[in-house]
């Protein structure tokens, strides 16, 4: 069932069920003294509040409303009180000044339906000992500078496999599905870090199945759902999100259990590496699972792998696809990026990660992609752990807080020509995506900043540089750059609605 028809169904149900909410409405009216200090927002309809204004692309709908009601805006979705942040100044307040109070999580029904919020490093509150333990494990075993450096050769190998696939497609003059190809590359990088195996192949359906599963889960987790606004309706599963999410995550859990069982069997035979540096992520987790005082059980491991797998694969491949789409739509920008690489690297070379620091225009292209197409347009929803004042307005306890980084990246008061893809805006400017410049925070900030940020930036930059250095690119079937659509499909991760196909043309001067 699509979003629009699903919304119509639950709006009708809301009307029929309104009698159950009379007491809630009355309590809200009795609290009018505090409401005077709430951020401004659009008028609310009885019972449903502002649900009718969400639309199928909430990040865009909220951006339009913010033009009227300001950079900190109150919305009510059924029983759910929300505040939407739409300026760098307000984002700083949330992500830095009041980070501790606003670092809770507001999980949705599709996350709660399989108990993920109770064991997930993404959804647990930072105040919990379990979150601190899982966060430490994630950083130490996967995202630390030492681990990132240790997997550099792996990234290089997998990106060269991508280039080889593009070479074969170029020889056949075939258009390539950029999303599928980039996902296969990122999938194999992440699966080797986690399990020491390739899970994807460029000439099989396996990668496609994984990508469809992960994208389906991210969309189910992110799209509007009646149960998020009226929790008592969750058991009805009006839009089928619970059923979809349980089915999708169970597929991934089966894969994880297979690897866990295989590694446990190998270890029982003594076939495992005693060299810590050679252990993959799952090896290290299973060691922590041993003994009577184990820090983790199998359920913890499955859910942690789910966090690492979904967040690590989908976001990076989506960003690469958006970057290629923008460059194909702006061919002069592509030529400029390629000219920089030819000048710096010369000919008949292979792009190394160490080369990226000497390619400022390429880095600007990546930043510009993050600005216009942040992987998580509203970040992951935060929750106020207590009442807190933000820019002079009261954000009550338990309010959902959404930081609309998509809208901030397109704010004309912050960016000149905000809708245009212009990497030049970053040249000579010390602006990065590390959570310190609040006009550009695609990975969040504060204690909730994405720990995989360095790995993601390295992976996307190396993939993009390698594709631009080795190939020229053209659109298939006579499509001209001006006609390339940039429609979006909303979820926790923001995807292109329509598949991006492009034909790689091998450069004659590159071996």
From Swiss-Prot:
SUPFAM superfamilies, per the entry: Cytochrome P450
Cofactor(s) demanded: heme
Subcellular location: Membrane
GO MF term (any one): 8-hydroxygeraniol dehydrogenase activity
Highest taxon of source: Eukaryota
Transmembrane segments: 3-23
Gene3D superfamilies: Cytochrome P450 (1.10.630.10)
InterPro entries reported in the protein's UniProt record: Cyt_P450, Cyt_P450_CS, Cyt_P450_E_grp-I, Cyt_P450_sf
Keyword Transmembrane: yes
Documented EC number(s): 1.14.-.-
Alphabetical keyword list: Heme, Iron, Membrane, Metal-binding, Monooxygenase, Oxidoreductase, Transmembrane, Transmembrane helix
GO cellular component, one term: membrane
Topology of this chain in the membrane: Single-pass membrane protein
Family stated for the protein in its record: Belongs to the cytochrome P450 family.
This protein's name: Cytochrome P450 76C4
Biological source species: Arabidopsis thaliana
Name of the encoding gene: CYP76C4
């Amino acid at each position: 069932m699509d979003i629009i028809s699903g919304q119509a169904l639950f709006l009708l149900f809301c009307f029929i069920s309104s009698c159950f909410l009379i007491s809630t409405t009355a309590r809200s009216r009795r609290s009018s003294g505090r409401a005077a200090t709430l951020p401004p927002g659009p008028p609310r309809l009885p019972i449903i509040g502002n649900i009718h204004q969400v639309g199928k692309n909430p990040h865009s709908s909220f951006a339009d409303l913010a033009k009227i009601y300001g950079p900190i805006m109150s919305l009510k979705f059924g029983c759910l009180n929300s505040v939407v942040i739409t300026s760098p100044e307000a984002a700083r307040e949330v992500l830095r000044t009041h980070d501790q109070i606003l670092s809770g999580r507001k999980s949705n029904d599709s996350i709660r339906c399989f108990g993920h919020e109770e064991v997930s490093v993404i959804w647990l509150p930072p105040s919990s000992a379990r979150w601190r333990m899982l966060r430490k494990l994630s950083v130490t075993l996967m995202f630390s500078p030492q681990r990132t450096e240790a997997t550099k050769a792996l990234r290089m190998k997998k990106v060269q496999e991508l280039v080889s696939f593009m070479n074969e497609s170029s020889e056949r003059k075939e258009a390539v599905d950029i999303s599928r190809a980039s996902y296969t590359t990122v999938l194999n990088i992440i699966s080797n870090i986690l399990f020491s195996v390739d899970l994807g192949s460029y000439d099989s359906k396996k990668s496609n199945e994984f990508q469809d599963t992960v994208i389906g889960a991210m969309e189910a987790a992110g799209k509007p759902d009646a149960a998020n606004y009226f929790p008592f309706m969750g058991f009805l599963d009006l839009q089928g999100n619970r059923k979809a999410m349980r089915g999708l995550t169970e597929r991934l859990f089966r894969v994880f259990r297979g690897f866990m069982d295989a590694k446990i069997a190998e270890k029982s035979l003594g076939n495992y590496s005693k060299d810590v540096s050679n252990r993959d992520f799952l090896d290290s987790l299973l060691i922590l699972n041993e003994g009577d005082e184990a820090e983790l059980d199998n359920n913890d491991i499955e859910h942690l792998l789910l966090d690492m797998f979904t967040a690590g694969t989908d976001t990076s491949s989506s960003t690469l696809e958006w970057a290629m789409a923008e460059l194909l739509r702006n061919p002069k920008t592509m030529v400029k990026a390629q000219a920089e690489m030819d000048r710096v690297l010369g000919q008949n070379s292979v792009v190394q990660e160490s080369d990226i620091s000497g390619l400022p225009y390429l880095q600007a292209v990546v930043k510009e992609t993050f600005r216009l197409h942040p992987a998580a347009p509203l970040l992951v929803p935060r929750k106020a752990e207590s009442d807190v004042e933000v820019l002079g307005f009261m954000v009550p306890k338990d309010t959902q807080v959404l930081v609309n980084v998509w809208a901030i990246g397109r704010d004309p008061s912050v960016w000149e020509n905000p809708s245009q893809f212009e990497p030049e805006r970053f040249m000579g400017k010390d602006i990065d995506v590390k959570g310190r410049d609040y006009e550009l925070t695609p990975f969040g900030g504060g204690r909730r900043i994405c720990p995989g940020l360095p790995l993601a930036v390295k992976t996307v930059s190396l993939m993009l540089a390698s594709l631009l250095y080795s190939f020229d690119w053209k659109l298939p079937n006579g499509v001209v750059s001006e006609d390339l659509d940039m429609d979006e499909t909303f979820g926790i991760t923001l995807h292109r609605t329509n598949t991006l196909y492009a034909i790689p043309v091998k450069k004659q001067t590159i071996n």
